């Protein structure tokens, strides 16, 4: 299993440990806003989002409305995106609208 995330059509950022990004969706949902991979950075006490979903594409954080923390133990942490992963470690803060 892999640490993956998606942004649903309702703008929910959802985390999980799954084989495929589609496994994060319920039967009546779809994902138009992409996804990727995630990891917890213990040093920064933050969640790092990186990569893209082969099923749903690159994440569109402009469509993010809220974060569902259930898939990461329910603990809210700062979010950062690595847009150029794996080529550099630039971190861009991610926030909800």
Can you name each region flagged by the protein language model?
Residues 1-97:
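Intrinsic low-complexity, intrinsically disordered or marginally ordered coil/linker segments
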